[in-house]
């Protein structure tokens, strides 16, 4: 039996948000989690919250039942060879690193290592994440269910059968918050030009995004049908839609998504 139920390599913003979400959901206690961070200041902060802390990432790998790899992708070339030298029973590995493939991790840790790749997005830090998961051949269905249950406490989850889908889905979840932030920024700038305060514009637009999202998720109409329902003939909205269509919004988004996906594949080489 391992000393800790859950370990985190890279207890930065996302890694810490995940472990804290699991603790809030009652999946384990803070003292059942071991967090690695090179920063003494961050280790002290996590220790004050009741977590066990360390500056030795091999200790996390050897003493935890499940290990979350939350370090930056460029740090894997340093960490994987060190973890490969660890002896004893292997943990369940959960990686949130974009572009670090099963093949790369298995080459270092062994093909018999149970690995689940997880792609969360930043709203997870507020408990509103959209997370995608896929398991390798060595991971059992029960292990996938265990990890999915963890991320279900922080938003919604989708499981894919094929690893490549984690690249294909990036524009619609992982990168999508930036799309929405850009759209919000453009709307606020436009509102300010028309004499509306930036704060008021942002409040109104954000609530409109929340309400519109709920209408899409909870209703029985498609996005296209909802657009049509708002666009009264000869009204104001249809004039705005005409400009967006003439300027090629759909084509612009399609090109942006294609570039995003292509870059994800490049990072995985």
Language-model features: locations:
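Rossmann-like NAD(P)(H) cofactor-binding subdomain of soluble oxidoreductases
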Residues: 34, 40, 49, 57-133, ...
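NAD(P)+-binding Rossmann beta1-loop-alpha1 motif at the extreme N-terminus of oxidoreductases
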Residues: 1-55, 59-61, 128, 192-194
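Short pre-catalytic strand/loop immediately N-terminal to key active-site residues, enriched for Gly-Thr
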Residues: 165-171, 223-228
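Internal alpha-helical scaffold of NAD(P)-dependent oxidoreductase catalytic cores
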Residues: 104-114, 130-168, 179-218
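Small-residue helix-packing motif on alpha-helices
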Residues: 33, 43, 60, 197-204, ...
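NAD(P)-dependent Rossmann-like dehydrogenase/reductase catalytic/cofactor-binding core
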Residues: 2, 206-269
């Amino acid at each position: 039996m391992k000393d800790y139920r859950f370990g985190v390599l890279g207890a930065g913003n996302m890694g810490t948000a995940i472990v804290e979400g699991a603790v809030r959901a009652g999946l384990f206690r803070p003292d059942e989690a071991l967090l690695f961070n090179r920063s003494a200041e961050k280790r002290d902060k996590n220790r004050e919250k009741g977590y066990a802390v360390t500056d030795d990432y091999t200790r996390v790998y050897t003493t935890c039942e499940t290990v979350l790899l939350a370090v930056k992708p460029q740090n894997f070339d340093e960490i994987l060879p060190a973890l490969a030298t660890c002896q004893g029973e292997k943990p369940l590995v959960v990686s949130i690193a974009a572009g670090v493939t099963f093949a790369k991790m298995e080459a270092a840790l062994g093909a018999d290592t149970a690995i689940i790749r997880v792609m969360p997005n930043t709203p997870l830090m507020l408990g509103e994440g959209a997370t995608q998961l896929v398991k390798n051949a060595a991971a059992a269905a029960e292990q996938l269910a265990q990890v999915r249950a963890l991320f279900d406490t922080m938003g919604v989850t989708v499981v894919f059968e094929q690893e490549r889908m984690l690249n294909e889905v990036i524009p619609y979840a992982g990168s999508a918050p930036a799309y929405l932030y850009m759209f919000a920024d453009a709307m606020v700038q436009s509102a300010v030009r028309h004499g509306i305060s930036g704060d008021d514009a942002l409040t109104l637009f954000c609530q409109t995004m929340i309400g519109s999202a709920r209408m899409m998720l909870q209703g029985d109409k498609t996005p296209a049908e909802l657009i049509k329902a708002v666009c009264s003939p000869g009204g104001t909205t249809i004039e705005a839609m005409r400009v967006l269509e003439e300027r090629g919004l759909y084509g612009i988004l399609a090109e942006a998504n294609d570039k995003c996906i292509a870059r994800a594949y490049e990072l995985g080489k």
